[in-house]
A protein has these predicted regions:
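Substrate-recognition/cap regions that form aromatic- and gly/pro-loop-enriched pockets
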Residues: 342-431
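Acidic, glycine-rich active-site loops and adjacent beta-strand->loop/helix elements
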Residues: 78-80, 141-149, 171-174, 213, ...
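Active-site metal-coordination/substrate-binding segment of hydrolases
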Residues: 66-148, 153-164, 201-204, 315-318, ...
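Acidic/His- and Gly-rich active-site-bordering loop/insert found
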Residues: 3-105
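His/Asp/Glu-rich mid-to-C-terminal helical/loop segments that flank catalytic regions of hydrolases
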Residues: 38, 158-159, 225-242, 271-277, ...
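Midchain, well-structured core segments that form catalytic/ion-binding scaffolds
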Residues: 104-107, 147-148, 154-366
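Active-site-adjacent substrate-binding region
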Residues: 220, 227-229, 234-250, 402-445
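Zn-dependent metallopeptidase/amidohydrolase metal-coordination segment
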Residues: 9-10, 337, 344-346, 350-359, ...
């Protein structure tokens, strides 16, 4: 790892981030980072333990003169989203993140950076290690598996935490203070299909959709970005309708909370239609590229011939699945009527897999209104059940209802305005912060979320602003010294 990362200011923050990013920490595979964090806490002589689900808690007493302040919980999640470009050779299970400086940004070579939520975790580590930063009594809460199920937050029991104020460090714009967030639910459709013999006189093709930006399926869902699964399905729908295309297999998207950037489909077409099919596809490709020319300038759609496969998908099942995906809502479903520019409800068709007689379609539906969340989830369920799929609604977690009378909110607003000569944006976000879940068992805890500027989270374009990290660090230090008295 380049020494240039460790030389960035504030060094305490960037050095801890570099230490953390040397440890592989995929969601649901956090064993190494859990041990890393426990060893870190123990090495400082601080009370360190894990709960039943393996969240790590480290307690640090108040510094002299701060004993009369309310105890705080500083919270971040240990896992990170693992995404890489198709041509990047990298093993997230064994390798640390390869970071570099690009102007005002810290990036990773061909992969996600892990600033979500690594910079938040590194902040807490730096505070725990410090000897000269005034602060009240701190409980550091490092949760597991935030990115693929909110498992740590959902299974944290009441009575473990003693703090009265929670500072969540998982917001990704430094001029925002978050006081609310969306809940979510996974919608997973599955079914089997029979494989049929390839008709005589067929030609094989591989269709590849790539070059899309991808991004966070909550925070970026309103940016007009392309969804590789929906684009691929549009191509398949047209070719099936006009030329009788048959699907061999599809592999689209990866993670439920990332807007899919790539999809690959193997198909066959009758040789007698091949020339007309290619001509028609090129026209549709040109149309799609024109539609996305502003938001997706690097979109690439390629069709190349391949060896003829042995089997193809059952035509009846294929038609149903293609039509269901076409009908399934993707993107913003409803904007909030209560907060300007806030997405209320959305869906991301994250994963489409067709292979070896098995179909899987995975969606993540989000909403800040619980009833609207289930309304859209049931609409999706209905579309897929109509074509013979079994549909599971799972992993539901609640949103976080804003408290505009929060005491800690007033503290943060005053500090931000004093430091930056402007008011912060007090917002709710269309993402799954853990605050809403934690508030279920700790309803009296005063919660707030903020953080440094991070762009492109959940994609290989993820980057963290160096100047923003400096601004954010000063903000954190001032907050710690101004926590309200008990």
């Amino acid at each position: 790892m380049s020494q240039e990362i460790r030389n960035l200011e504030p060094k305490a923050l960037w050095n801890k981030f570099a230490d953390l990013n040397a440890v592989p920490r995929p969601s649901k595979k956090e064993e190494r980072v859990i041990e890393f964090m426990k060893n870190f806490g123990s090495s400082l002589g601080l009370e360190t333990f894990e709960d039943e689900i393996r969240n790590v808690i480290i307690r640090k007493p108040a510094t002299p003169g701060m004993e009369n302040r309310k105890a705080i919980v500083m919270q971040g999640h240990l896992d990170m989203v693992h995404q890489k470009n198709g041509d990047t050779v990298f093993d997230f299970d064994t390798q640390g993140i390869d970071m570099y400086v690009d102007g005002d940004w810290v990036r990773a070579r061909g992969t996600t950076l892990g600033a979500d939520n690594g910079l938040g975790v590194a902040t807490i580590m730096a505070i725990l290690e410090s000897t000269d930063i005034p602060h009240p009594a701190i409980e550091a809460l490092f949760t597991i598996d935030e990115e693929t199920g909110m498992t740590g937050a959902l299974n944290l029991k009441g009575g473990i935490l003693q703090g009265q104020i929670l500072l969540n460090l998982d917001t990704e714009e430094d001029d925002e203070i978050d006081i609310g967030c969306a809940g979510g639910i996974d919608v997973t459709a599955t079914r089997t299909y029979h494989e049929e013999e390839v008709p005589e006189g067929s030609v094989g093709h591989i269709i590849t959709v790539k070059g899309l930006n991808g991004g966070h399926s909550g925070m970026d869902i309103n940016k007009g970005l392309g969804n590789a699964n929906k684009i691929m399905n549009r191509l398949l729908f047209d070719a099936f309708e006009n030329f009788g295309l048959q699907v061999v297999e599809i592999n689209g998207g990866s993670l439920r909370n990332a807007i899919p950037r790539e999809s690959v489909a193997k198909v066959i077409i009758s040789e007698m239609f091949d020339e007309a099919y290619i001509f028609d596809m090129q026209e549709i490709i040109n149309d799609i590229k024109a539609e996305y020319k502003t938001t997706e300038p690097n979109l690439s759609i390629e069709i190349v011939k391949c060896d003829l496969p042995e089997k193809v998908m059952d035509l009846g099942v294929q038609e149903g699945i293609i039509r269901a995906i076409y009908a399934a809502h993707n993107g913003v479903y409803r904007m909030s009527a209560d907060m300007d520019d806030l997405v209320e409800t959305s869906n991301n068709i994250a994963r489409v897999i067709v292979k070896d007689g098995e179909i899987l379609i995975g969606c993540l539906t989000r909403s800040s209104v619980e009833t609207s969340k289930f309304d859209l989830a049931n609409a999706l369920r209905s579309a897929f059940e109509l074509v013979g799929c079994e549909v599971e609604l799972s992993g539901s977690y609640p949103g976080w209802t804003p408290n505009v009378n929060s005491e800690i909110l007033e503290v943060l607003k005053e500090i931000y305005e004093k430091q930056n000569n402007e008011k912060p944006k007090v917002v709710a976000c269309h993402a799954g912060l853990e605050c809403g879940i934690l508030g279920t068992n700790y309803p009296e805890m005063d919660m707030i979320s903020f953080g440094p500027t991070i762009h492109g989270a959940h994609s290989p374009d993820e980057r963290a602003s160096i100047s923003s990290a400096q601004k954010y660090w000063k903000f954190v230090l001032e907050i710690l010294s101004n926590i309200p008295v008990k």
